[in-house]
Swiss-Prot record:
It catalyses: adenosine(1518)/adenosine(1519) in 16S rRNA + 4 S-adenosyl-L-methionine = N(6)-dimethyladenosine(1518)/N(6)-dimethyladenosine(1519) in 16S rRNA + 4 S-adenosyl-L-homocysteine + 4 H(+). It comes from Flavobacterium johnsoniae (strain ATCC 17061 / DSM 2064 / JCM 8514 / BCRC 14874 / CCUG 350202 / NBRC 14942 / NCIMB 11054 / UW101) (Cytophaga johnsonae). This is Ribosomal RNA small subunit methyltransferase A. It is an enzyme of class 2 (transferase). S-adenosyl-L-methionine binds at residues 13, 15, 40, 61, 85, 105.
Length: 261
């Protein structure tokens, strides 16, 4: 079968550098799980290295042409190709009560959404590793005080330890993207339960960063906080000045004020 043609509307950029594919596969620790799901395998440059590992590898791919190519060229994937959109797929069809890692050279147009979906299933996903646009990979790992620190940074780091691993040139893709790429990894924290209401925590973080240049006193007005709470000095800060731990404290204060999630 001929090679798959990259489709712009799917954000496809096929990695052609074998050493980088192997390096991404090798970021997996293989600890605490024996199942791996690769998102957007394309023509399988990363898949071939995953299939050599002592884990049960499945792939999920929305592009029917890629699905056909994988079926022809990777017989080991027989019955392990999920022809679906990861963002809509019912993960528990395959992984109910199972721990599994996620890996991929992620489609750039949905990479942030892939992370948010991973957070939804964090009880089942101890490890997440892969390639993003460089700025997205950096944002996930960013610490407070940076202009790129935001919703994705705080929510990911609330449940996972994040690590930016290495930068990848535009020249190792077909077609080459317009920006550099970055590989990062998330490892679920040993204790990843929050000492505050999780739903309210998500609401506070998202609401705060929707008006990131304003102080929390102004950006969180819609939560109808009491005047007494709004006098707390934490509300003098802007959202990018708060660490993950400080967002948890902020949520606890808001909970104590009687605000429900």
């Amino acid at each position: 079968m001929e090679k798959v043609k990259a489709k712009k509307h799917l954000g496809q950029h096929f990695l052609k550098d074998e050493s980088i594919a192997k390096a991404i596969a090798d970021t997996l620790s293989l600890k605490g799980y024996d199942e791996v799901l690769e998102i957007g395998p394309g023509m399988g440059v990363l898949t071939k290295y995953l299939l050599d590992k002592p884990v049960n590898t499945r792939v999920i791919e929305i592009d029917t042409e890629s699905v056909e190519y994988l079926g022809v060229n990777y017989p080991k994937l027989k019955d392990k190709i999920i022809s679906e959109d990861f963002l809509k797929y019912n993960i528990n069809q395959v992984y109910e009560n199972k721990q599994f890692a996620i890996i991929g050279n992620f489609p750039y147009n949905i990479s942030s959404q892939i992370v948010f979906r991973t957070l939804e299933f964090r009880d089942q996903i101890p490890e997440f590793s892969g390639m993003f646009q460089k700025e997205v990979a950096e944002r996930i790992c960013e610490k407070k005080g940076s202009k790129t620190y935001g919703i994705l940074s705080v929510l990911a780091q609330a449940f996972y330890d994040t690590e930016y691993l290495f930068t990848v040139s535009e020249n190792v893709f077909i077609p080459p993207p317009k920006v550099k790429s970055g590989v990062m990894k998330m490892t679920r924290k040993e204790d990843y339960s929050l000492p505050c209401g999780e739903k309210l925590f998500f609401t506070v973080v998202k609401t705060a960063f929707q008006q990131r240049r304003k102080t929390l006193r102004n950006s969180l007005k819609t939560l109808n906080l009491s005047d007494k709470l709004r006098e707390d000095i934490i509300f003098d800060k802007r959202p990018e000045q708060l660490s993950v731990e400080e967002f948890i404290v902020l949520t606890q204060k808001i909970e104590a004020d009687g605000v429900q999630s």
